[in-house]
Amino acid sequence: MDLKKILPKNGPPINEVSKYIEKYKNDLIVIKYGGNVFIDRKIFDNFITDISILNKLGISFAVVHGGGPRIKRELDKSNIQSKFIRGLRVTDEKIINIVESVLIDFNNDIVDSLKKFGTDAVSIHTKKNNIIKVTPEAKELGFVGIPNKIDNNLICLLYTSPSPRD
């Protein structure tokens, strides 16, 4: 692989990159992408470019993302005032539908943007393939829960497949 063709001109030295490719080539890297980053499209586009480069270098990854600011904006648009108990947002059915919709939109934006760069990407979310099992935190919190099991079969299947598909 010719790293000079893949790496940005202002990127790190090739010998540094080679060292990390070798170190992580058999691992699945989990990247947490906060919802605040979605506010600035330029930062988002840079993130997509960087992830696409990792993919071209043979690094496997999973992106876990948030959506806090957009969730708040959508709740405000719907005139929904959030209530908090012990620092946790009380989440009724109306709120969970908005949260889910925002997060799925972000998820699709990430996947579609990666595909435009030639990166195989698959969307995993609650409406399609809910892999996270939770225990409700407390009845008064509504849909707030504690993750207690992640069914990683789908993740493992995608990680070992040569070309993931939706």
PLM regions: where:
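Glycine-rich loop at the start of a catalytic domain that most often binds anionic cofactors/ligands
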Residues: K42-T49, R73-Q81
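Conserved small/polar residues in nucleotide/adenosyl-binding loops
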Residues: Y159-D166
